[in-house]
Amino acid sequence: ATLLFSCKQGGQQNKKNDDKPVITVTIEPLRYFTEAIAGDEFTVVSMVPKGSSPETYDPTPQQLVDLAQSKAYFRIGYIGFEQTWTEKLTDNAPHLQFFDMSENVELILDDTHAHHHKDGHVHEGHTHAGGVEPHIWNSTINAQIIAGNILNALCAIDKANENAYMERYNALIRRIEHTDSLICQMLSSPNADRAFMIYHPALSYFARDYNLHQIPIEAGGKEPSPTHLKNLINSCKKEKVRVIFVQPEFDRRNADLIAQQTGTRVVAINPLSYDWEEEMMNTAQALLTPRSPKGEGE
């Protein structure tokens, strides 16, 4: 069901300046969603630049200076960078309004399929920054919720333009729903894989949306031990995995090793890409490969 988000709750009217006001976000996918709804009303900048890990990134002194000029900060809420830096960013720019884009998202605990429920009850699972699997944007369901959170935030800080934000929000929702429809169509094919391996488990929400099995290579955020590698090779064969995803900010040597032992393909993806729709489609497309003759690798 589509949630209706009201712009009329809270917020204050912005006085327009000659210079375009700035909104800062943590990562590039969030910049994509924010720009899609904000249009030309704001300049949107990302704290974590392309090619950097949002788990370990440290902002430059210039970024901290620039942040003081921002109107608002949109955060995912559970990324390592945010866990480490939010308090410091607040101290650096006490006027800055923070908005959590994970609000109303049903969260997953790390590499498990346990859920963090709204009543605060958390099932036992792995620990990550904040104890939560943070890659909420890699999901068409969550993307619609994030879009609603962005809409509410923009209306709170700039009520005068709420109608324009609502129009762009509706257009973005249509694009997200179209992307979801195409992915559902692809993954409903009998040739579509139901399991995949990935170095860093960034596709937990993608896997949940489409009932897939994600098998992470790293163990607790660390390189796999020789024993764990052997278990992964066995899992790869047992689950009939044909694709191993690797990301640019992580070492791919273990993925290549498993691929050599199992005949699987290594496919590069970038879940942190600004081009969210294209990245989601590419990920789904990689799971839709013609079957090889029996006994042969890819």
Question: What are these language model-derived features?
Answer:
Residues C7-E298:
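Extracytoplasmic metal-acquisition and chelation regions
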